[in-house]
């Protein structure tokens, strides 16, 4: 049948066409091409007599720890922590809005017995009873809500670092309390936040709220070494508003010149604008299931002014280290679920590749002393509605992270037509408010930025900063150092592959089911699979050879040699004393067949992965043991053939990549079964196992011993109509034993009869399989 194509690929995937090998070397290998560098041509290296360079700065980059500043009175800025370094006992600071908020913090040294002390707060002499029986300093937060009331101690901070913090944010005043090194934050609400002022009696620092994790670190562990040196003198707070005027900083400075080469220090201010890309894939069926919500790379092009020069910039934003979340509202077809949605958190990284058309990027090949400094940015998620057919729509909303510059390297950025040497800026993250939730579900108050709507309606996020580097460039400014060739060739192919994948996926809805079943019954071989392509016979033969060569490197081809040993290991490692109920996924004793037998004991806990791996190996066993019935690979190959015929003209360079990819990705959720007398044992890639009788379709205990014996000796059958569908069909329509047996054996004629009768349950199952044929 149609899966003959995969068996033929497995058999013939080691034939090689010399022309294809040479072409592959030209497209996938890279080679450095340089201009003649004069006397340095003998060594084939760039000059090694590096000179020194200088780095000027211009764009203001917000410091993490700004200060110290002298004691003063001012209105605290919104979204900034004021970190006060108390150096004596007494009043640390006073803050009020003259209406409903009066607070003062007093410091009490260690080992103080209960005593009444006089303090001057808000111009009044007040007597507070204080006590400190610990080895650390205590900071008592005294509060009153009216000028007529008396102060009372609302919170206490016990600290050995002698640091106190206050933040104005979100209509509240936030402070620290508890004991170092495990302090917490708490807030006070007041009606008139705009008129609040603070009188600080000690030196202090200012930290942006985006760096709150650093502020916590300072409160718990003390300030870093530099601010504690005696050479740092506190400045007046007014120094923050001084406008610095500097000489031109966006400039190129020649450091040294040798023969045809020179070294230049390149300094640039930059504005980085980027956006996140995402992909939302909905499963087939009744419309209540989503397959995945994931991040993907996104390009953005824009213009901005730099010292009067119009700059055209191009950025590519990508994400690494995502966290996979899921939501399952139940197992019914009408229960809402999301199989996987990606969230970026503290352990994730965001990469932004930046290039512009200025002179700085013309010769960015031999580079040293690359440095950069960038501001931080907060990215807040928006809402995405899961439009289910009936009922109130679940909505994923919220989530935020702050991006902090963590490093810069050289990179190669690809556009549709050219590859560009660019700078890759790496950003670490801290989670921020608000949290995200999926409304009308149990998923609430989680932190991070989900991929559903990461841009929140914004066209882009923006970061400003600067970078500098020392580059080795030709002395003649009209020359340009060539970058690696042939990279663009491969990138153009990737772009064509992406377009073809999208076209293939969109065609799934257009496949006629009766046509698919008829095609799946044909013995599709290598020639007939590609004969529909508008090309000559010679091109078809060449394409078949290229497909074989690509298929040789696929996971399916490399796994076939390990299949026998893996199944043997799995069978021998099963427990010999356990019988289990089939509808409970956590009872499987199969080991992960991809591991050595010596790792059996350690891998018993990974149940879903183990059963999933076994089912993948069952596919290989089925593929090399043809049976009478139709297989899942018959459907997969038929869909592939249909899409090839329906698609726009396909290039001979793209199809060889598509076919192996289809063999791996089409129908990822597969079920396989083994028959023994009147009993069926079924296992799927999601880790579920079932055992049931053919006559009644009633479940029986899943016998691991029996399955271990059968798996190496009995034929493996694709469960095209899986157990859940069979059960649903029997409960709603009633089927005879002969019909049940034919459906269990995937008899193609019986399947076609049910489809011709427009049986909704069978049609829905086949439609779901077709919709799973995506790249």
UniProtKB/Swiss-Prot annotation:
Q: Which UniProt keywords apply?
A: Capsid protein, Coiled coil, Disulfide bond, Hemagglutinin, Host cell membrane, Host cytoplasm, Host cytoskeleton, Host endoplasmic reticulum, Host membrane, Host-virus interaction, Membrane, Outer capsid protein, Viral attachment to host cell, Viral penetration into host cytoplasm, Viral penetration via permeabilization of host membrane, Virion, Virus entry into host cell
User: According to the UniProt record, where is the region Spike body and stalk (antigen domain)?
Assistant: 247-478
Chain segments carrying region Spike head = 65-223
Which parts of the chain are coiled coil?
483-510
- Motif YGL motif: chain residues: 447-449
Q: Which cysteines does the record link by disulfide bonds? A: 317-379
Where does the record place the region Hydrophobic? 388-408
Its recorded name reads Outer capsid protein VP4
Q: Which GO terms describe its cellular component?
A: host cell endoplasmic reticulum-Golgi intermediate compartment; host cell plasma membrane; host cell rough endoplasmic reticulum; host cytoskeleton; membrane; viral outer capsid
GO biological process terms held by the UniProt record: permeabilization of host organelle membrane involved in viral entry into host cell; virion attachment to host cell
The UniProt entry's sequence similarity note says:
Belongs to the rotavirus VP4 family.
Q: What else is known?
A: This strain probably does not use sialic acid to attach to the host cell.
Motif range for KID motif? 643-645
Q: Per the Swiss-Prot or TrEMBL record, what residue ranges does the short sequence motif DGE motif cover?
A: 307-309
* Pfam families on file: Rota_VP4_MID (PF17477), VP4_haemagglut (PF00426), VP4_helical (PF17478)
Say which domain of life the source belongs to.
Viruses
Region ranges (Spike foot): 509-775
- What transmembrane ranges does the database entry give? none
Q: Site annotated as Cleavage: where?
A: 230-231, 240-241, 246-247
